[in-house]
Amino acid sequence: MICFIFTYKDFIIKMSTFWQNLWLIYLFIVFYVLGMSFVVWLLLRSASIKNFIYTLVAGVAEAAAQATQTELNYHACKRYTKACNDADIPVNPHKIEELTTPRGGTGRN
């Protein structure tokens, strides 16, 4: 059976190596962030890239808004169904469709 026994000296050497490596990692991260910031700055100077990024951000915002509306519709249907079940009233499928249809549209493609 092999036992690895680390002396205090070995521990100090390993820790100093760790801290040296940590500084190297820190410097790499700093230079990486600075380099990527410079690349992004160069890309943003281009009008077509700028329009692309604006379109991408607008698309993400629109998707988030649709997801939020879908969640609100789901909770509205859930409340309506629960209220109907509590009052022993049959659930009206037209009301469910009305709750799930986006305002200003038919909800069909």
Swiss-Prot record:
Predominant subcellular localization, coarse grouping: mitochondrion
Q: Name one GO cellular component term.
A: mitochondrion
Question: Domain of life, per the record?
Answer: Eukaryota
> Is Mitochondrion there in the keyword field?
yes
Alphabetical keyword list: Mitochondrion
The subcellular localization recorded is:
Mitochondrion
Name under which the protein is recorded: Uncharacterized mitochondrial protein ymf14
Organism expressing this protein natively? Marchantia polymorpha
Gene symbol? YMF14
